A protein has these predicted regions:
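Ankyrin repeat structural motif
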Residues: 118-122
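Enriched but not universal
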Residues: 1-43, 201-216
Length: 216
């Protein structure tokens, strides 16, 4: 239920929400519109509490686990006693015989804020974490020819170093022959943010738990 309260000489709608079971892709604006009759344009004062043992997760790296893109002037208090976790990126495809590995996919963000003043209280044992970036694919390897010099040694070997970042799902190829060309592994994907600010955000962060990733 939305209740009007006076704040700074203005009427501001207020409500409290408790999340008591695991949820994916929680959208605060949609939740308020669908369940509380909020019109989506008036500023609102809302407190959201995530219970201990509850996980808010994202279904894809292109979505966030907890989204609060609100009307300007909104005040949010987010009490997290559980886990808010972004989606991890996929590993890059390993290279073929004549190519390097592909880069890993960037991880998704855990929380996204827009147009609000927010206080985040992350309790002891609670977690807010962006999704980890996927490992880069391992580089391929190509053997070329079997040239031998007068002393019986192979010549002409060429090696290309692996790319930056971990190679999570890929394994570098190996080849035999006199000249072996090893192609670089792909770069690891970037980690998602714990908290992303789109625009118009004033944030106070009180952290007694774990936060993995950037917070703005």
């Amino acid at each position: 239920m939305l209740m009007p309260v006076a704040q700074g000489g203005h009427q501001l709608l207020t409500t409290q929400i408790t999340i008591s079971s695991n949820t994916q892709d929680f959208d605060l604006q949609a939740h308020l519109t669908n369940n509380f009759g909020w019109n989506g344009s008036d500023a609102i004062d809302v407190t959201v509490t995530i219970n201990s043992g509850v996980t808010i997760s994202a279904s894809a790296v292109t979505t966030v686990a907890f989204k609060a893109h609100m009307a300007s002037g909104t005040v949010l208090t987010l009490n997290n006693n559980g886990q808010i976790i972004g989606k991890g990126g996929s590993g890059g495809t390993g290279g073929g015989g004549t190519s390097g590995g592909q880069s890993g996919q960037a991880g998704g963000h855990a929380v996204s804020f827009q147009d609000l003043t927010v206080t985040v209280n992350n309790a002891a044992l609670a977690l807010i974490g962006g999704g980890g970036g996927g490992g880069g694919g391992g580089g391929g390897s190509q053997a070329v020819g079997s040239a031998v010099d007068s002393e019986g040694d192979c010549t002409g070997g060429t090696n290309f170093g692996a790319g930056d970042g971990g190679r999570g799902q890929g394994t570098d190829g190996s080849g035999s022959g006199c000249k072996v060309v090893n192609y670089g592994g792909g770069a690891g994907g970037a980690a998602g943010k714990a908290i992303r600010h789109v625009s118009g955000v004033s944030q106070t962060l009180n952290n007694s738990g774990t936060i993995s990733g950037a917070t703005s």
